[in-house]
Design a protein with these regions (language model features):
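Phosphate-binding P-loop
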Residues: 1-4
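NTP-binding/hydrolysis catalytic cores, primarily Walker-type P-loop NTPases
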Residues: 260, 264-294
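P-loop (Walker A) phosphate-binding loop of NTP-binding proteins
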Residues: 12
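Flexible beta-alpha connector loops of hexameric P-loop NTPases
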Residues: 73, 77, 101-108, 152-160
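Conserved catalytic-core segment of NTP-binding enzymes
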Residues: 15, 19-23, 30-31, 35, ...
Length: 294
């Protein structure tokens, strides 16, 4: 499979989206230079890699991997500074009450300019032969983010914003430049949300989902007879049953993704209190074999 230049990682909250984004970025950086753009307010993906970006300046994690923090408000300010290059005037505009009224009258403008920044970064990545991995918001907010250009077109049917919206739509619909990776866990609610997200972004926006990542899949430790022998252990036996169920559920839901035209990749459960570089390396090896190198 050809990996698109930009991978947009999203999924239901609690499915390990940021961990997967960090692991994919680390795995890709073994092959060519990669940038991880962290859109999460908590900067979880950046933190897992040991980086603490504080603004729109990239922080180097390794020789081939850097991390950047992006926020909608910062992109709005950067846009104003580009079109009003005299800093004193642009700063005054951003602080003015009138400007606040204007942005309130254009819902989604900040998110729209964030998408435009990602499109520009994707173009730069193509020129520099690098990958861009985006730790996006959880799936509901991610769909809103990806859909924002249609709202801007409705408000601005002509002019600069409309032209930018056309460029963004073209970017999102180009499978060589942009693709989504959706995280899930073996639980039914997470699986349903992943399938709904993939269908929505495909039908509404033409966005291709590269793969569904089934995260936190434990190994099968006990067969049925062994589980029965554990019953005197009470709570420990219940944990063993729950672990087996999670493993079996991952196999049971795979056909649902296949029916939707999606391949699934299982990532093992990391039985650690926190995810760090060691765990990301382990997950990255699985992703390199099953997603990147296949």
């Amino acid at each position: 499979m050809t990996i698109p230049r930009v991978l947009f990682i999203t999924g239901k909250g609690g499915t390990g989206k940021s961990t997967v984004a960090a692991a994919i970025a680390l795995a890709l950086s073994r092959r060519r230079p990669t940038t991880l753009a962290d859109l999460d307010r908590r900067m979880s993906a950046a933190a897992a890699l040991g980086a603490t970006p504080t603004d729109s300046t990239a922080v180097k994690v390794t020789e081939t991997l850097d991390v950047i923090a992006l926020t909608p408000r910062a992109e709005l300010e950067a846009f104003i500074e580009r079109i009003v290059p005299i800093r004193a005037i642009s700063r005054r505009m951003l602080r003015s009450r009138t400007f606040g009224y204007v942005t309130a009258a254009l819902p989604g403008l900040e998110a729209f300019l964030l998408l435009e920044r990602l499109r520009i970064m994707a173009g730069d990545a193509a020129l520099e032969d690098r990958y861009l991995v985006i730790d996006a918001p959880a799936s509901g907010s991610a769909v809103e983010l990806l859909s924002v250009s249609s709202g801007v077109k409705g408000i601005a049917p002509a002019g600069t914003l409309n032209r930018l919206a056309d460029s963004i739509d073209s970017f999102l619909g180009d499978a060589t430049r942009f693709g989504a990776v959706i995280t899930t866990t073996p639980e039914d609610l997470a699986v349903r949300e992943a399938l709904e997200t993939a269908a929505t972004i495909r039908e509404r926006l033409g966005v291709v989902t590269v793969a569904a990542i089934m995260n936190c899949v434990p190994d099968l430790l006990f067969d049925t007879s062994e589980l029965a022998s554990l019953s005197p252990l009470g709570g420990h036996a219940r944990l063993a049953v729950r672990r087996n169920c999670a493993h079996e559920n991952a196999a049971l839901v795979a056909p649902r993704f296949a029916d939707a035209g999606l391949s699934t990749i299982n990532l093992p459960m990391m039985f650690t209190p926190a995810i760090g570089r060691h765990e990301l390396e382990k997950l990255g090896r699985v992703l390199d074999a099953q997603l990147i190198g296949r």
